[in-house]
Regions:
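Conserved, mostly hydrophobic/aromatic
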Residues: 8, 26, 56, 81-83, ...
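Active-site acidic/histidine proton-transfer and metal-coordination neighborhood
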Residues: 1-54, 156-157
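Gly/Pro-rich active-site loop or hairpin
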Residues: 61-133, 147-157
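A non-catalytic, amphipathic alpha-helix used as a structural packing/dimerization or gating element
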Residues: 7-14, 73, 122, 157, ...
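Active-site beta-loop-alpha junctions enriched in small/polar residues
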Residues: 31-33, 58-60, 84-86, 110, ...
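C-terminal helical cap(s) of enzyme catalytic domains, especially alpha/beta-barrels
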Residues: 148-178
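A structural motif corresponding to the C-terminal end of an alpha-helix
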Residues: 14-25, 121-133, 168-176
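Short, well-ordered coil/turn segments that N-cap beta-strands
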Residues: 20-25, 48-51, 77-79, 130-135, ...
């Protein structure tokens, strides 16, 4: 309810004052399975507090908030970015309560950059055009359940594919900047 959101936002702002006094800042991280998951949750915090945000593309998308829309709504509040792609078809059973988040991860819900439904290239390009100069963190969720993967297998493969994709985005963006 509104009273609970007002209280949560007031606490976030109070925490922000405390950390700012020590030369730090905080960033709220929207995440599947938490209090701040769906667009209405995110907007409740955006409207009621001044807290910074971890722009987690994958978790925003899985919660139903288009990352491009979030960027338009909260660009000036982004503290850092989690680069994360998601396949919404594999997230659907998790959202319906038919699978746990861990089962969704095991099934490949969070995939290498460019293999999912997040408009990664569009979002990164817009962040760069808008002058974002903070951290980008490549976040690749993996669920290793049967011991250590063989060399050249496991999450390393997905991370390398994501890096390759991000390099391609960077090359396109850089070429576009030089042409302008």
């Amino acid at each position: 309810d509104a009273t609970a959101w007002d209280h949560a936002a007031a606490m976030l702002d109070e925490i922000e004052e405390i950390v700012a006094a020590h030369g730090m800042s905080q960033a709220i991280h929207p995440h599947l399975g938490t209090m701040i998951e769906r667009p209405s949750d995110v907007k409740n915090v955006l409207e009621r507090s001044q807290v910074g945000w971890t722009f987690d593309m994958g978790h925003l998308m899985i919660g139903g908030y288009d990352p491009v829309e979030f960027l338009a709504d909260a660009r000036d509040r982004i503290a850092h970015v989690h680069l994360k792609d998601v396949r919404l078809d594999l997230a659907a059973p998790v959202l319906r309560g038919e699978q746990s988040i861990m089962q969704g991860v095991q099934n490949g819900m969070f995939c290498p950059m460019g293999d999912g439904d997040v408009p990664v290239a569009e979002v990164v390009s817009e962040l760069e055009r808008s002058g974002y100069d903070g951290w980008y963190v490549l976040e690749q969720d993996a669920a290793i359940t049967d011991g250590e993967p063989a060399p050249g297998e496991g999450p390393k493969v997905d991370v390398l594919r994501s890096i390759e994709y991000l390099r391609a985005i960077n090359a396109e963006f850089t070429a576009g900047q030089k042409a302008s």
